[in-house]
């Protein structure tokens, strides 16, 4: 129950942040300025720039704290030993004959690889949210446009992760397992 609730909160908050982020993008597009490609209204949340920012910055806290709680939970229960990519997984991918073991190794590799992307998304988001207070963080990204571009690029990477995570979950346990993640 607890992990399923966290899982659902992460997915819902990600979708809300993506759609509100697209509203922010429409106000000042990252690629091509104000004449750049515009996201269709139906794919955005917030109605205008300030509304998009309100949604984005509110949900950002839900997302970040949910990830933090999940991280603490994984650490305290020592589930990280089974969740993250290890030497045994590398061996299974290189020479392993057991297809299920290889699938789980791929799953852990994908699961582990999203961590730096999420840190980058949160770090770049915080740098834009409070650039004066977190000037040291903002400076790590060289300039404002680079910061915005990096933050924006974490979205398709996260979407790709969700898609691959979903497909691998279906391959490992079928639709029944995947559906069970959303039943409390």
List each language-model region with its residue ranges.
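Membrane-embedded alpha-helical bundles that constitute the cytochrome b-like, heme-associated redox core
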Residues: 1-184
